[in-house]
Regions:
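Conserved catalytic core of the tyrosine transesterase superfamily
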Residues: 1-329
Length: 329
């Protein structure tokens, strides 16, 4: 049964079939979800084609419930399908991607707040007696330290398996990073030791195919982002650190730990006298960034908190972009 209902239902189905295998499963699911939304509007209007009016109505609906950046991303998905239709000989309206400015400023936890969060999370392990809950408590405590100690994206350690850890070298292989990249991430000796004890306590150290953070409900699967996201919200509320987020903003979340890591790594390198033009590129590679623009986003912080580091990074970025501009002339 075709899940699409509009006059373009066959083309939509064919487009997804062609896309399968050329993009990740997550991207394919996002594409399907977005195209289903557009297809519903086409079916509702009983449209025989794709006009400017219909496309703008769909975009207008997105703007009411999504952040500008999200709208731009969804329009980009639609544009790819519309290009496919044009290739097939259809005359369709092609919208521009709405221009957005990156206004996202992450919540930066203070050192004191981080210590408070860790202490509270650690107390959960001794508080609960249910085996599954205790397992999740242990996983949560370890995950927090890995995010803080290595600046991982949340999905990276969740996808990792025991075989990806080299305890003697203190490294972890991230096989499935953003943009289908891989990288080997060095860990601090203290974190490596803690991770080894965790694996022994979880009885997974001798199980190379075991996920580092196994699901308590589904055997052989990894714990989900949502599971830890809910636990983090509970932790924030318990420590009275919860701050309601603004509409369409990420707010306080585990991804903020990645920003915390980036900022403090940059600050630590500067305090040790390491030149900025050495530390920033290294940090960019360590975080698995595609370019310096990505790293710049992770060094967004309040100038009131770190005025000296703000100026240092801005000076470095300006010199880099000036050199690039000179080369292009």
């Amino acid at each position: 049964m075709n899940e699409f209902k509009s006059v373009f239902k066959n083309e939509l189905t064919e487009y997804l079939a062609i896309s399968q295998g050329t993009i990740s499963d997550g991207t394919l699911q996002n594409t399907r979800r977005i195209l289903l939304s557009f297809d519903s509007l086409l079916a509702e209007e009983n449209a025989g084609g794709i006009s400017e009016k219909t496309v703008n109505r769909w975009i207008g609906g997105l703007l009411q419930t999504n952040a500008p950046k999200t709208v731009s991303d969804k329009v980009s998905y639609l544009r790819k399908f519309l290009r496919y239709l044009q290739y097939e000989g259809y005359s369709v309206f092609m919208p521009d991607c709405p221009k957005t400015s990156d206004s996202y400023v992450p919540y930066i936890f203070s050192d004191g707040e981080i210590q408070m969060l860790l202490a509270s999370a650690d107390s959960w392990v001794g508080r609960h007696t249910d085996p599954q809950t205790r397992q999740m408590d242990m996983e949560f405590c370890m995950l927090l330290r890995m995010l803080l100690g290595c600046g991982f994206r949340l999905g990276e350690p969740l996808a990792a398996k025991v075989k990806d850890i080299n305890f003697s070298r203190g490294t972890i292989l991230i096989r499935h990073a953003k943009n289908n990249k891989q990288r080997i991430v060095p860990m601090d000796v203290t974190l490596t030791g803690m991770l080894e004890k965790y694996c022994i306590a979880m009885a997974i150290k001798t199980e190379p195919e075991s996920h580092l953070f196994p699901s308590v409900r589904k055997k052989g699967a990894a714990a989900t982002k949502g599971t830890f996201g809910l636990r983090f919200r509970k932790l924030l509320q318990e420590t009275n650190l919860y701050v309601p987020g603004k509409a369409h903003s990420r707010g306080q979340c585990l991804h903020c730990f990645r920003h915390y890591f980036a900022i403090h790594s940059f600050a630590q390198a500067e305090k040790k006298g390491r030149p900025v033009n050495d530390s920033v590129p290294f940090l960019s590679v360590y975080l698995g960034h595609h370019d310096m623009d990505e790293t710049e986003k992770y060094l967004k912080f309040s100038s009131d908190m770190f005025p000296e580091y703000t100026e240092l990074f801005e000076d470095y970025a300006a010199s880099v972009f000036m050199e690039v501009g000179d080369e292009e002339k």
